[in-house]
């Protein structure tokens, strides 16, 4: 790992240094790297050992795979040929001996009470591992590097896109163990709609949502305050309801409980709280989240009718009123989600309102046939406006390129509203998607937040797949069997 790589890691909070230890004649100053196993996963660790002030040693550690558990060096000591490194407040311990030739440190690695053999080797040049955090999703044999605008375009390869959709959702869920609107949340509110074409979604994702629901149901009533973050509750309810509508075709007890939980934490004005509303477009605006809640209600088989005349029924009407009033919106972007929700929840909007939204979407279509998310709202309109400086500094500000997220979402909304698949404007959008898939199977969308993870590229691939399916441009079943299904 180069020094510039280490500086990069430090800026992202992955690296912590502590200076301790005694002087030893052996020159340990180098970058060292090695692998160990933790819960069946191979994990890689990189150490930078250098001389500090007054002849002491200093050590810096970096896990390449531990995105959410960075290496924090507590102490580093050298005694003769022996070295000892303690990390993360006692969670990790390296005890080793420097080989006679000075090229290896052999010993044991203990992490969370589990001890494994570990050999660290000097690394440099071509042998050094890449900068940490260079991937978007990683879990066992699944690794997707971070998307870039320079990734090569390929001829349409649906299997690559489906593999990414399936594997990315599993990798996020297994690694982070949370419901995230940008990944497994998007999977659960989109993937079931492709059941007829691709087969059922992965049951493991539904099971995870049910487990999350059970944790929510166990939440103490006093903790369900107005500031309670409801994003997860909304996505769990929507994911389970859409699963019922398109996979089992009947309401499950889990879905009924999830919908009850969702309305239990609804705010008095009809929307839901987002505690970290800094991440547009999916985790930044209460109105947009309310459109997801609307999809939950509209999809749950025979559920809404059973709520009439009840307290929950009154809350459903409150949601309708809230959405019809169009409160604080992220420009036209949230109106696209409103049209999608209205198509799945009859009675939310009248035909005239829907046609106005259709016209708005078509007005945003670009010359190349695609749509750009950046034309749908001014920089200050996204979330709390906290990304405006970043967005205004982009070179493409005046002519933003079409992207997978918005092109897919626009086509979904148009088709949901009844615009024919053969409509020339729809076909121009389909043509853009077929020409702009990247080598990894994804469609690229530049993040509105920060140029790092680019998680929007996940919805920016899931949306195009559904859009193509709705336009009759996704191949028949059989082409989309994935590595995930075989694991």
How should each PLM-predicted stretch be described?
Residues 9-21:
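Bacterial N-terminal signal peptides
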Residues 477-485:
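Intrinsically disordered, low-complexity segments enriched in small/polar and acidic residues
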Residues 135-156, 174-200, 219-260, 267-316, ...:
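An alpha-helical repeat/solenoid feature that recognizes helix-turn-helix modules
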Residues 26-118:
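Central antiparallel beta-sheet cores of small beta-barrel/beta-sandwich binding domains
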């Amino acid at each position: 790992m180069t020094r510039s790589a280490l500086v990069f890691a430090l800026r992202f909070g992955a690296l912590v240094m502590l200076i301790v230890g005694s002087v030893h004649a052996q020159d340990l100053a180098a970058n060292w790297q090695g692998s160990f196993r933790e819960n069946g996963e191979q994990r890689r660790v990189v150490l930078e050992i250098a001389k500090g002030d007054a002849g002491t040693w200093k050590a810096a550690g970096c896990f390449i795979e531990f995105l959410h558990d960075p290496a924090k060096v507590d102490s580093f000591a050298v005694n003769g040929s022996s070295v000892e490194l303690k990390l993360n407040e006692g969670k990790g311990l390296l005890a080793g001996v420097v080989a006679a030739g000075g090229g290896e440190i052999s010993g044991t690695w203990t992490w969370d009470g589990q001890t494994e053999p570990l050999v660290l080797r000097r690394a440099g040049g071509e042998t050094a591992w890449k900068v940490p955090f260079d991937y978007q999703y990683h879990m066992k044999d699944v690794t997707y590097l971070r998307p870039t605008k320079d990734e090569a375009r390929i001829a349409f390869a649906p299997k690559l896109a489906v593999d990414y959709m399936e594997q990315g959702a599993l990798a996020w869920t297994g690694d982070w163990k949370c419901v995230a609107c940008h990944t497994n949340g998007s999977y659960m509110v989109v993937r079931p709609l492709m059941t007829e074409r691709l087969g059922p979604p992965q049951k493991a994702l539904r099971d995870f949502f049910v487990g999350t629901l059970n944790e929510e149901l166990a939440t103490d009533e006093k903790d369900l305050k107005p500031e309670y973050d409801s994003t997860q509750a909304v996505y769990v309810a929507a994911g389970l309801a859409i699963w019922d509508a398109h996979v089992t075709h009947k309401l499950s007890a889990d879905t009924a409980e999830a919908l009850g939980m969702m309305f239990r934490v609804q705010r008095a004005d009809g929307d839901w709280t987002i505690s970290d509303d800094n991440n547009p477009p999916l985790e930044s605006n209460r109105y947009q989240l309310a459109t997801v809640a609307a999809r939950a209600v509209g999809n749950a088989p025979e559920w809404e009718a059973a709520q009439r005349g009840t307290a929950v029924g009154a809350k459903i009407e409150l949601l309708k009123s809230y959405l019809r009033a169009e409160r604080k919106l992220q420009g036209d972007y949230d109106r696209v989600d409103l049209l999608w929700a209205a198509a799945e929840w009859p009675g939310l909007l009248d035909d005239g309102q829907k046609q106005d939204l259709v016209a708005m979407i078509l007005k945003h279509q670009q010359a190349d046939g695609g749509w750009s998310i950046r034309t749908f709202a001014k920089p200050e309109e996204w979330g709390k406006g906290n990304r405006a400086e970043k967005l205004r500094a982009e070179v493409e500000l005046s002519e933003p390129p079409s992207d997978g997220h918005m092109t897919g979402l626009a086509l979904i909304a148009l088709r949901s509203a009844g615009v024919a698949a053969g409509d020339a404007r729809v076909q121009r959008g389909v043509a853009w998607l077929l020409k702009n898939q990247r080598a990894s199977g994804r469609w690229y969308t530049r993040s509105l937040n920060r140029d790092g993870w680019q998680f929007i590229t996940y919805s920016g691939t899931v949306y195009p797949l559904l859009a193509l399916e709705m336009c009759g441009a996704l191949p028949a079943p059989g082409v989309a069997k994935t590595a995930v299904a075989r694991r």
